[in-house]
From Swiss-Prot:
Annotated residues for binding of GTP: 75-78
Annotated positions binding ATP: 23-30
Record protein name field: Nucleotide-binding protein DVU_1631
Family according to the record: Belongs to the RapZ-like family.
InterPro entries: P-loop_NTPase (IPR027417), RapZ-like (IPR005337), RapZ-like_N (IPR053930), RapZ_C (IPR053931)
HAMAP family, sorted: RapZ_like
Amino acid sequence: MSSPARSADDGFEAGFPVLIVSGLSGAGKSTVLNVFEDLRYFTVDGLPVRLAPDMVRVLDAQALEQYQGIVLGMDLREAEFVQQFEQALARLQEMGVRPVLLFIEAEQGELMRRYATTRRPHPLESEGMGLELALAEERRRLAPVREAADLVFDTTSFSIHDLRRVIQRRWSSLKGRMRSLRVNIISFGYKYGVPKEADLVFDLRFLPNPYFDTSLRPQSGLDAPVVEYVFGTDSARTFRDRFIDFMTYLLPLYEAEGRYRIAVAIGCTGGRHRSVATAEALLDVLRKSDYAVTIEHRHLELG
């Protein structure tokens, strides 16, 4: 990232992308913010619109080092929203910040259906309007915001997975940071049970078992002698290489479908030797591929 934000007199410069998400109540603004949060954006929902420039200023580059950028969610609940929104945009532009404005909407009938399903009140119903009139009035009031939007998302026929794919394709790599898919590698022992959260499970009980070598039994798949034993045959090394090739082929396909988290469980009998060695081999490769990857040896001390 660039140097930290400075005062206006110094010529403030934002070193990170700034996005503003607004739109019709019930159209999916909160869902959009959740997707951006999963993509490692710093998200703030319900921010008073007049505070947007100050928020951008105080969140300097160092504070946002682990994030892709800022996403601010704003809606009509605030009095004089449209007027203050226009003033906030003008202030941001004076600061040299050109935020990307996303407007989220849906067709009237779909919004009516969603409110009937959730049974939540529309913000404008507190002004004495019925739901249908409140939706129409909100659309009218927010017309200037929609007109100023860089992108308008109509979520009428969008599932959450559709929405995630659209946002992911466009904004997941603005800063060239880690890929959006988070991979959790879990080694485990079948004698203790398969991890319930696993999306993919691989059974490695066909590999050479160090347990039957009394000198290796106290060690684990974290130790070099065990790794050399497990992958000491041509067939074991071929499996390891093909397994890793398979995973590096498969993970981008999950990523392209909008998945943001996947748990890969790798098991052997006790969860101490073969599964640990293979999980560590996969970890080494995935870390070089810029995935956000974690590893857990669940039964290492039990096996």
